[in-house]
Amino acid sequence: MLELNFSQTLGNHCLTINETLPANGITAIFGVSGAGKTSLINAISGLTRPQKGRIVLNGRVLNDAEKGICLTPEKRRVGYVFQDARLFPHYKVRGNLRYGMSKSMVDQFDKLVALLGIEPLLDRLPGSLSGGEKQRVAIGRALLTAPELLLLDEPLASLDIPRKRELLPYLQRLTREINIPMLYVSHSLDEILHLADRVMVLENGQVKAFGALEEVWGSSVMNPWLPKEQQSSILKVTVLEHHPHYAMTALALGDQHLWVNKLDEPLQAALRIRIQASDVSLVLQPPQQTSIRNVLRAKVVNSYDDNGQVEVELEVGGKTLWARISPWARDELAIKPGLWLYAQIKSVSITA
């Protein structure tokens, strides 16, 4: 568990944090440049020293301004991956990985190297590596120090699109197989969507929102980053069954299910899906003989007028689903809170 209760001056603003983060999964730190994202993880790592408050990791006090406690970075058991890999140019990859390696990680070396796909790189110098390869090595080096927490400061920011696509699957694999909590700084919605379990949104050094990805994603806090045409719902689902004849997979959403193209995932595997609001249409009665495979019973929570369109908030299996319809459709269907209807979903994308 990471307990953050501190403040630190940032130019004209003050970074003020009072949150407790669980000791698992990835928490994305999101916001515009200058919001305080990097300053937050620098304070956690010990690169900077807050003027007030405390930082506590798994019961160990890293910072306590009133008591004058400030552990040096090497004593914090916190790994840090920067935007630029910062590898030692005169060491081969193997030497970079072993630099600072904890004795407790010696037996894990081969497993971690395989997990990151860097075994073919072990005898190469950093100068011969691509940007994505360098970052994989940097992540491996940080993990081999046996940290209790891993900080990643926009690790994909300096990479071109092909290299980002190369690295994302490795990061997704790490979240599933390495039981180390991570703080992932980013201003990329795509990275957050594919990696984060939770999101903390910072603005001018203040926490504007903090919670599960699916909750924060659907909140008004994200409106500045999500154009209305990109309004969507993020939902947690599990694999229910596979239909081999039609090559389809059913995903459980509460006591209902969604069909998607066949997935190579075991039954009960947990996944996250994204449904665009523009891909959801509403009907009052269950349609007959329709080509749309996904028709879900839903209850209207509320509706909001927005520049000639209507955003309808629905509840499906205890989850929030958004639909975008016209004012004409709203009036004709008599949309109001508490109304039960059917949501027809034209498209579903898997995010994680």
UniProtKB/Swiss-Prot annotation:
SMART domains: AAA. Signal peptide: none annotated. Residues 1-229 form the ABC transporter domain. The keyword Cell membrane applies. It is found in: Cell inner membrane. One of its GO terms (molecular function) is molybdate ion transmembrane transporter activity. One of its GO terms (cellular component) is ATP-binding cassette (ABC) transporter complex, substrate-binding subunit-containing. It is a peripheral membrane protein. Its main location: membrane. NCBIfam families: modC_ABC, Mop, PRK11144.1. The gene is modC. GO terms for biological process: molybdate ion transport; tungstate ion transport. Gene3D superfamilies: 2.40.50.100, P-loop containing nucleotide triphosphate hydrolases. Its EC number is 7.3.2.5. Residues 289-352 form the Mop domain. SUPFAM superfamilies: MOP-like, P-loop containing nucleoside triphosphate hydrolases. It catalyses: molybdate(out) + ATP + H2O = molybdate(in) + ADP + phosphate + H(+). Part of the ABC transporter complex ModABC involved in molybdenum import. Responsible for energy coupling to the transport system. It comes from Escherichia coli (strain K12). Keywords: ATP-binding, Cell inner membrane, Cell membrane, Membrane, Molybdenum, Nucleotide-binding, Translocase, Transport. The keyword Translocase applies. Belongs to the ABC transporter superfamily. Molybdate importer (TC 3.A.1.8) family. It comes from the Bacteria. This is Molybdenum import ATP-binding protein ModC. ATP binds at G31, V32, S33, G34, A35, G36, K37, T38.
